């Protein structure tokens, strides 16, 4: 069963009562306005409410058509039908005040009104003169309707609407009243857009997103405006196909040129607006301020990061310093402990040595003869120098707990062992010296008598001269040879070649041979200066390393500090050497004076040797 909606206002609904007779089968075809509305909704896939809106829209258009008042075109009767293309079609139909906003219904109604008023038959009946054929001005009305009733032709005419203002405001015009100048311009140019919902220019309170969307739209403006209406040649008038193609080509080129000019006009409009827009300036200033703020924030972050890194570095340095101080303190404590142990050992060995001397003295050195006692005293001193603490303690225990004969036997046995050890050491040293001499003779090739018979004094003098004249001295080896010839007590004259050969042979010596040379030099020094061995002057395991004035050699840094102090405090300075000693940490006044004297002697020796070399070279010339 088909259910129809209720009737609208002003319409009635007829109710048919059911008959009591039997029902019969019949065919019914749907008709009427309700069925028409149903078919429209089904074809458009729309609801009832949509159809109601469509009906209301049609009713509103009809009411607007009824309210539309046509404007009489005063120049209508003077128009030339042959020049219909240059006429204003909207004005001819009385729609000059509506123009492109006029609907097709309005155009049709306006044409109907103009036909009823200006048709030649009606005017002829009224007694007005009529021109024959297409020469009558009514032809202009017909042409106007033909152009405006066709959507394609109407768009072509709208594109070149003679009343449209194509002007573009200059920058100077919009400096003070930007929105008042540019808002109507963009409003009227928005009619050419293919896209609907054209964004508005807005005002000073518009957001950045709205302004950016506005200029993005207009910089990418998609215009439907075309200029086919201005074609100078009509292809319909062509006599052949080639002529028609040529006309089409000319028209396309002209349209493209005008389209390009139109897009340039739009671009100029947008550029002028963008350059004058106060919002753009405001946004740029805000962006600049934002960047400056971000820059300051980054700089502050970098500064804090740098401070954190510096703080961490200082903490690490402090930790390293504390660790180093702790390590140095541990080393110092160990050194102090070792020193204490060494002092204890020195005291113990000193005590044992004194005990050994007293024990031997109590036994009258185990001899009644004066010469034997002196010899025994020397042997006892030798034992004190050579024996270690354990051996001394063992020997003292024997002497304290035994008789004279047993003590003498133990003492003599210990003396024999020490003498045997010294004899072996001397033999080994002599063997090394002989081997060193042979190697030196081989290295020098046995040249000259000057390369032989190097005494211990000459060797020590050579070592001293090599240290005195370092590498880089002019004619170094000649200077060293002259220095040795002046200061040597052997009387042997040495040449530069002899000195070089011996220096090379000394460099090849092993450490034991160097120790032997130093030991012999020190033994000779003791004999010459009468230095008696002291019981507490050396540790049990110490060996003689040769004569040394300072216990600690001077470092390069100490030498620089001494030289600077000598320059800072001249000779006339009161308490000069005390101040110099204060400027050199770790050195006493005596150390500084002794080092100064050594430097003076070295400088004098260098000058003397160099003068001799210079004099010898002059004599040879």
Swiss-Prot record:
Physiological role: Acts both as a chaperone in the cytosol and as a chromatin regulator in the nucleus. When cytosolic, acts as a molecular chaperone: component of the ribosome-associated complex (RAC), a complex involved in folding or maintaining nascent polypeptides in a folding-competent state. In the RAC complex, stimulates the ATPase activity of the ribosome-associated pool of Hsp70-type chaperones HSPA14 that bind to the nascent polypeptide chain.
Protein name as it appears in the record: DnaJ homolog subfamily C member 2
Keyword Nucleus: yes
Lineage: Eukaryota, Metazoa, Chordata, Craniata, Vertebrata
Entry note about domains: The ZRF1-UBD region specifically recognizes and binds H2AK119ub. The ZRF1-UBD region is also involved in protein-protein interactions with other proteins, suggesting that it may be masked by some regulator, thereby preventing its association with H2AK119ub.
Protein transport recorded as keyword: no
Pfam families per record: DnaJ (PF00226), Myb_DNA-binding (PF00249), RAC_head (PF16717), ZUO1-like_ZHD (PF21884)
Source organism of the structure: Rattus norvegicus (Rat)
Gene it is expressed from: Dnajc2
Modified residues (N-acetylmethionine): 1
Cellular compartment(s): Nucleus; Cytoplasm, Cytosol
Annotated stretches, region: Disordered: 287-312, 426-453
């Amino acid at each position: 069963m088909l259910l129809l909606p209720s009737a609208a206002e002003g319409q009635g609904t007829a109710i048919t009562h059911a008959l009591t007779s039997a029902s019969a089968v019949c065919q019914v075809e749907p008709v009427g306005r309700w069925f028409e509305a149903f078919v429209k909704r089904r074809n458009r896939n729309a609801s009832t409410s949509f159809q109601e809106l469509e009906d209301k829209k049609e009713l509103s258009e009809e009411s607007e058509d009824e309210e539309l008042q046509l404007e009489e075109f005063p120049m209508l009767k003077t128009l030339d039908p042959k020049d219909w293309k240059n006429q204003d079609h909207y004005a001819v139909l009385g729609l000059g005040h509506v123009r492109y906003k006029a609907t097709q219904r309005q155009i049709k109604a306006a044409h109907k009104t103009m036909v009823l008023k200006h048709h030649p038959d009606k005017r002829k009946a009224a007694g007005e003169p009529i021109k024959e054929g297409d020469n009558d001005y009514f032809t202009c009305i017909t042409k106007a309707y033909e152009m405006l009733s066709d959507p394609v032709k109407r768009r072509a005419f709208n594109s070149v609407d003679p009343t449209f203002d194509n002007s573009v405001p200059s920058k100077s015009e919009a400096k003070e009243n930007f929105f008042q100048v540019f808002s109507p311009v963009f409003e009227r140019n928005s009619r050419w857009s293919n896209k609907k919902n054209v964004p508005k220019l807005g005002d000073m309170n518009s957001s950045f997103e709205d302004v950016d969307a506005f200029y993005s739209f207009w910089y990418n403006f998609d215009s439907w405006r075309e200029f086919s209406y201005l074609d100078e040649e009509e292809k319909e008038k062509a006599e052949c196909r080639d002529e028609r193609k040529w006309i089409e080509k000319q028209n396309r080129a002209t349209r493209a040129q005008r389209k390009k000019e139109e897009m340039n006009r739009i671009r100029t409009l947008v550029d002028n607006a963008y350059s004058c827009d106060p919002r753009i300036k405001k946004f740029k200033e805000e962006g600049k301020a934002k960047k400056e703020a971000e820059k300051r924030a980054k700089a502050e972050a970098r500064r804090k990061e740098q401070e954190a890194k510096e703080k961490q570095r200082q903490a690490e340095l402090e930790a390293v310093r504390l660790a180093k101080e702790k390590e140095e303190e541990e080393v110092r404590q160990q050194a102090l402990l070792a020193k204490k142990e060494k002092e204890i050992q020195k005291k113990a060995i000193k005590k044992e040595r004194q005990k050994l001397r007293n024990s031997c003295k109590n036994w009258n050195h185990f001899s009644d003869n004066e010469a034997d006692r002196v010899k025994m005293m020397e042997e006892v001193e030798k034992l004190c120098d050579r024996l270690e603490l354990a051996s001394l303690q063992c020997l003292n225990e024997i002497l304290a707990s035994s008789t004279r004969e047993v003590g003498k036997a133990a003492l003599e046995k210990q003396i024999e062992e020490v003498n045997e050890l010294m004899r072996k050491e001397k033999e080994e040293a002599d063997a090394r010296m002989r081997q060193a001499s042979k190697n030196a003779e081989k290295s020098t090739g046995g040249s000259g008598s000057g390369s032989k018979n190097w005494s211990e004094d000459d060797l020590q003098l050579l070592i001293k001269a090599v240290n005195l004249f370092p590498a880089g001295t002019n004619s170094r080896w000649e200077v060293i040879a002259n220095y040795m010839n002046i200061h040597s007590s052997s009387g042997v004259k040495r040449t530069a070649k002899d000195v070089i050969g011996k220096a090379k042979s000394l460099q090849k010596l092993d450490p034991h041979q160097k120790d032997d040379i130093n030991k012999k030099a020190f033994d000779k020094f003791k004999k010459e200066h009468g230095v008696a061995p002291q019981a507490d002057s050396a540790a049990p395991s110490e060996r003689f390393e040769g004569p040394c004035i300072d216990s600690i050699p001077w470092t390069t840094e100490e030498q620089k500090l001494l030289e600077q102090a000598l320059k800072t405090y001249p000779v006339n300075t009161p308490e000069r050497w005390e101040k110099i000693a204060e400027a050199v940490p770790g050195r006493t006044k005596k150390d500084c004076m002794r080092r100064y004297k050594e430097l003076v002697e070295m400088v004098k020796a260098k000058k003397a040797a160099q003068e001799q070399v210079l004099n010898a070279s002059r004599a040879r010339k």
